[in-house]
Amino acid sequence: MQIKKAEFVKSASSMSGLPEDGRPEFAFIGRSNVGKSSLMNMLLGRKNLVKTSKKPGKTVLLNYFIVNDSFYFVDLPGYGFASRSKSEQDLWRVVIEKYLRTRKSLADIFLLIDSRHGILPNDEQMIEFLDHYQIRYTPVFTKTDKLTKTELSVAKQKNQGSFFVSAVSGEGKDQLLDYVEQTLNAGDKKE
């Protein structure tokens, strides 16, 4: 798949603020600072379209980006960042859970996992939530440029069926975009 056009559309703090045009959505979720925004920029071929930060917890809204005028990438707030107030964390948990459980136009969820650390307890909780509600998701291991060849080979053996990407080197970009295209062509939306 070739990305010809990508634009920021809107940020939303609740379900009522989400686009209502029914276009397929690919949500990016993972721990704070796992590289969601950097990965989206790499996939979209735009260095600064999606705001990035070295400081965890930068994304605090559901951020929508229209791609090729036909589908959305949705940057979700990261989980596991404790410097936010408990009430703010609880509010976001409710909004994100409702989005993941009820959004009809959600084509897939990319669950991002830092390849250096593997699946951590917060990731396990998200996987359990997604499995419990039978929500389709695709594991994507990020920051593969930080691994040695041997470490990467072991990670790929342990996590077959997952994608392995680097926003720095571009590794995995074509495979992930091909997957997006296949999903769109199959019309495989959440029922």
Put a short name on every predicted segment.
Residues S13, L44, E97-K104, D131, ...:
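Signal for well-folded cores of large energy- and translation-related assemblies
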Residues M1-S83:
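Conserved G1/Walker A P-loop phosphate-binding module
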Residues F26-V34, M40, N63-I66, S70, ...:
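Structured catalytic cores of enzymes that bind and process phosphorylated ligands/cofactors
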Residues I3-S16, D145-E191:
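Canonical P-loop GTPase G-domain recognition
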Residues N68-L106:
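Conserved nucleotide-sensing/catalytic segment adjacent to the nucleotide-binding pocket
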Residues K58, F71, G78-F81, R116-G118, ...:
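Conserved nucleotide-binding/hydrolysis micro-motifs of P-loop NTPases
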